[in-house]
């Protein structure tokens, strides 16, 4: 959530309507004044959950000046973080900026951090707050184990795993969800529940009752001609793409296609990050379609790693990628679609999931 989004969420005036910017902000100010003067105290939520984005240096400091949390969660940073090109010192700068979120917490607060992320782990020794760690690593307070996908024939039904705490082991099933990153999200949620004295069983029951995939965030969709579309079109980064591709390795039976777009804002890490993605794609998919100039690097690396020329296709635009995909896909294929938001791969998802095709 950007700088303007946080105060809007706090006052509850965040629903954007189609109106000129001036009138929108006048409406927000009027709503805020009304809330201060007339709203009942019990009308405001007891717990407010805010996303603090670190697009550039200083973002977290600014957001903390608006609202300092009692619970801070750092889910992932990665060795090559998103928005790295906005930071003069690269990964180190991103770690330092995101670390401000948990460093601002006091002794009576709680930090929830991912034990699997090497960059996140560098922050642990500097945190003053009570710290709860989650992940697949041994020693995690909430540990993720036995991750796989449930299949019905050649169809992916969802993600299944176990959450292990000091006192219990709980099975979890997330229907219509693909990436194992969702397991981390659930584990983090259980940790946050613990910060509010909610036991793991009750927290998990509440999560499972309401958990649903969001468009562009690893939802499993029904595609044309009995295909399954893994919609990760909203954005892409090295860590997220690696997770998505590796998740494909637990799917057996159907042919796997990846439509991968540029990963943007990586700065000096751009070439190597795309090479690494191409090498991984060569091991994980049967057909690779790349979209964008940077994604060409993926295609070339996949070829260099032994992928057949007939299985690698290079495209400039999302429209070109769609045309190639429609020529090469077969009935029953599993198709991963992922790229940075500005590449526009959501249009490929929309076309491939049209009813009646």
Report residues per predicted region.
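Short glycine-centered segments of the SAM/dcSAM-binding site in methyltransferase folds
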Residues: 71, 110, 334
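A conserved, hydrophobic alpha-helical segment in the catalytic core
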Residues: 45, 66-79, 121, 172-213, ...
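Short, polar loop motifs at secondary-structure junctions
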Residues: 115-119, 136-137, 292-296, 342
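Residue-level signal for inorganic ion chemistry
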Residues: 6, 51, 63, 75, ...
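ATP-dependent carboxylate-amine ligase catalytic core
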Residues: 1-96, 180, 202
């Amino acid at each position: 959530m950007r700088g303007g989004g946080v105060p809007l969420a706090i006052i509850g005036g965040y629903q954007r309507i189609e109106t000129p910017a001036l009138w929108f902000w006048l409406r927000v100010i009027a709503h805020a004044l009304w809330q201060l003067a007339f709203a009942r105290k019990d009308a405001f939520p007891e717990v407010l959950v805010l996303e603090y984005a670190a697009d550039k240096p200083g973002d977290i400091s600014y957001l903390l000046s608006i609202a300092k949390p009692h619970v801070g969660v750092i889910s992932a940073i990665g060795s090559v973080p998103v928005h790295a090109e906005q930071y003069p010192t690269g990964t180190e700068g991103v770690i330092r900026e995101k670390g401000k979120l948990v460093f601002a917490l006091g002794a009576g607060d709680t930090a929830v951090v991912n034990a699997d992320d090497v960059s996140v782990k560098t922050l642990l020794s500097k945190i003053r707050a009570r710290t709860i760690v989650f992940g697949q690593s041994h020693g995690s307070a909430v540990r993720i184990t036995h991750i796989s996908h449930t299949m019905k024939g050649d169809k992916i039904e969802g993600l299944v795993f176990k959450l292990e705490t000091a006192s219990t082991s709980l099975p979890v099933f997330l229907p219509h969800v693909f990436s194992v990153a969702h397991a981390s999200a659930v584990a983090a949620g259980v940790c946050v529940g613990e910060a509010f004295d909610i036991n793991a069983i009750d927290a998990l029951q509440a999560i499972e009752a309401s958990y649903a995939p969001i468009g562009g965030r690893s939802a499993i969709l029904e595609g044309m001609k009995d295909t399954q579309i893994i919609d990760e079109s909203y954005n892409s980064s090295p860590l997220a793409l690696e997770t998505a591709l590796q998740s494909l390795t637990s799917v057996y039976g159907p042919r796997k296609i990846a439509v991968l777009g540029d990963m943007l804002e990586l700065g000096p890490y751009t070439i190597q990050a795309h090479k690494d993605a191409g090498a991984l794609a060569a091991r994980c998919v049967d057909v690779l379609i790349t979209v964008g100039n940077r994604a060409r690097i993926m295609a070339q690396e996949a070829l260099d790693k032994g992928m057949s020329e007939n299985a690698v296709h290079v495209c400039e635009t999302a429209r070109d990628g769609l045309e190639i995909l429609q020529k090469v896909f077969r009935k029953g294929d599993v198709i991963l679609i992922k790229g940075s938001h500005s590449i526009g791969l959501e249009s490929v998802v929309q076309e491939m999931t049209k009813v009646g095709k």
